[in-house]
């Protein structure tokens, strides 16, 4: 008789957990109890789940686990930004970054090891695509970070109330293109939103995409969360060069998809992310082109100073030029922000994720890895 497959319960959203418990002959309410123990009380095993029948706990011990990330490093920046490097096997590592602010705490989560989109200004794409992360590996980043942060503040695990939660916002802006890992990302986000798990609102969970148009439509139909689009260019010729996916889904299609998404979105605008590249996409003429491109899409712009990496052949736009570019947008009435660099002293700034593993040989020896992927968020 073949051995039974061990299930990582972090891979199951509420519906999946109900089905799993049903397969064990248990009622649906047991799934809610399990979910609360795992996602609200940070249970590491089944013994402490005291409101579950002992018979169920014994069943679970032989059939299921509560997976936890294999943390390779944990660093805190001078500005409070915290970065975890997580081993996801076969020499691959991804990073999770927490950015504290006065009124909120934002967690940047990865969805893939590597990335196939290969944007010109993004180091992750230069490393190639390795694999999709599982639902458990994605939501596990939130679980790990939330309870690590609570522990550092002396807060005990428990149901998420406003006074308890440390992470108030999640952005799917780490390594990878989330919409190319849709089947794992959506269940993970369902758990982020579930009141029996993390209880975040749809306005506080943001998915960032480079423009996978068919999956944008599917997300809008199934789980419309806040949406950010990695735009980076005001015309197809330049975007074809910077974001090769544009050749498959050009700007006309992308803008139409944004309009469709806004009909169901929890926010009344799309956030367009725009990496500022010196002499490439940063002139006032480019800004005016952007205004024409997006005139029918309610939006805000987030201008991102480029964080250079070796062999990119690109430079960060000068600060004064970024301000001039922003002013063109602001003068037209478009809300525009310039992203503040956070965590750059621990290589956790935008574009630096997992980009500073200084001694690869020692890290590989420690993890049994043959390679380490450098991760950079766009």
From Swiss-Prot:
Task: Kindly state one GO CC term assigned in the UniProt record.
Answer: cytoplasm
Catalytic residues in the record: 95 (proton acceptor), 350 (s-methylcysteine intermediate)
Q: Which InterPro entries match?
A: Aldolase_TIM, Methyltransferase_A, RlmN_N, RNA_MTrfase_RlmN, rRNA_lsu_MTrfase_RlmN/Cfr, rSAM
Catalysed transformations (reactions):
adenosine(2503) in 23S rRNA + 2 reduced [2Fe-2S]-[ferredoxin] + 2 S-adenosyl-L-methionine = 2-methyladenosine(2503) in 23S rRNA + 5'-deoxyadenosine + L-methionine + 2 oxidized [2Fe-2S]-[ferredoxin] + S-adenosyl-L-homocysteine; adenosine(37) in tRNA + 2 reduced [2Fe-2S]-[ferredoxin] + 2 S-adenosyl-L-methionine = 2-methyladenosine(37) in tRNA + 5'-deoxyadenosine + L-methionine + 2 oxidized [2Fe-2S]-[ferredoxin] + S-adenosyl-L-homocysteine
Query: Where would I find the Radical SAM core domain in this sequence?
Result: 101-345
**Molecular function as annotated in GO:** 4 iron, 4 sulfur cluster binding; metal ion binding; rRNA (adenine(2503)-C2-)-methyltransferase activity; rRNA binding; tRNA (adenine(37)-C2)-methyltransferase activity; tRNA binding
Q: Which UniProt keywords apply?
A: 4Fe-4S, Cytoplasm, Disulfide bond, Iron, Iron-sulfur, Metal-binding, Methyltransferase, rRNA processing, S-adenosyl-L-methionine, Transferase, tRNA processing
Which BP terms in the Gene Ontology apply to this protein? Answer: rRNA base methylation; tRNA methylation
Q: Name one Pfam family in it.
A: Radical_SAM
Instruction: Kindly state what the record says about how the cofactor is bound.
Output: Binds 1 [4Fe-4S] cluster. The cluster is coordinated with 3 cysteines and an exchangeable S-adenosyl-L-methionine.
Q: Where in the cell is it found?
A: Cytoplasm
Q: Main localization of the protein?
A: cytoplasm
Write down the EC number: 2.1.1.192
Q: Looking at its record, which EC class is this enzyme?
A: transferase
> Cofactor(s) for this protein?
[4Fe-4S] cluster
Q: Which SUPFAM superfamilies match?
A: Radical SAM enzymes
* Disulphide-bridged cysteine pairs: 108-350
Q: What else is known?
A: Reaction proceeds by a ping-pong mechanism involving intermediate methylation of a conserved cysteine residue.
Q: Which PANTHER family match?
A: 23S RRNA METHYLTRANSFERASE, RADICAL SAM CORE DOMAIN-CONTAINING PROTEIN
- Tell me its family: Belongs to the radical SAM superfamily. RlmN family.
Name-wise, this protein is Dual-specificity RNA methyltransferase RlmN
Source species of the chain: Burkholderia thailandensis (strain ATCC 700388 / DSM 13276 / CCUG 48851 / CIP 106301 / E264)
This protein's encoding gene: rlmN
């Amino acid at each position: 008789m073949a051995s039974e497959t061990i299930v990582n319960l972090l891979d199951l959203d509420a519906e999946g957990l109900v089905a799993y418990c049903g397969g064990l002959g248990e009622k649906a309410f047991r799934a809610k109890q399990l979910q609360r123990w795992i996602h609200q009380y940070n249970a590491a095993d089944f013994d402490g789940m005291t409101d579950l029948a002992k018979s169920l706990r014994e069943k679970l011990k032989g059939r299921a686990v509560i997976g936890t990330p294999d943390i390779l490093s944990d660093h805190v920046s001078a500005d409070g930004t915290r970065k975890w490097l997580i081993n996801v096997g076969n020499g691959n590592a991804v990073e999770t970054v927490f950015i504290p602010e006065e009124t909120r705490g934002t967690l940047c989560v990865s969805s893939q090891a590597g990335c196939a989109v290969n944007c010109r200004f993004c180091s992750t794409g230069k490393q190639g695509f390795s694999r999709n992360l599982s639902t458990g590996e994605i939501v596990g980043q939130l679980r790990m970070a939330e309870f690590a942060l609570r522990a550092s503040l002396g807060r005990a695990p428990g149901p998420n109330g406003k006074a308890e939660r440390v992470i108030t916002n999640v952005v799917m802006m780490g390594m990878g293109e989330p919409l190319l890992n849709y089947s794992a990302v959506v269940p993970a986000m369902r758990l982020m939103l579930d009141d029996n798990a993390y209880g975040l609102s749809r306005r506080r969970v943001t998915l960032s995409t480079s423009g996978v148009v068919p999956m944008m439509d599917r997300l809008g139909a199934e789980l419309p969360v806040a949406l950010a689009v990695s735009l980076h260019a005001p015309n197809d010729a330049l975007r074809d060069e910077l974001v090769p996916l544009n050749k498959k889904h050009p700007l006309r299609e992308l803008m139409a998809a944004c309009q469709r998404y806004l009909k169901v979105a929890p926010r009344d605008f799309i956030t367009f992310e725009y990496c500022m590249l010196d002499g490439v996409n940063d002139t006032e003429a480019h800004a005016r082109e952007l205004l024409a491109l997006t005139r029918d899409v309610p939006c805000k712009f987030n201008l991102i100073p480029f964080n250079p990496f070796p062999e990119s052949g690109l430079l960060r736009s000068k600060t004064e030029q970024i301000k001039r570019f922003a002013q063109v947008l602001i003068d037209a009435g478009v809300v525009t922000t310039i992203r503040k660099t956070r965590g750059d002293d621990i290589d956790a700034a935008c574009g630096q994720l997992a980009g500073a593993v200084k001694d690869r040989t020692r890290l590989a020896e420690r993890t049994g890895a043959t390679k380490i992927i450098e991760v950079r968020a766009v």
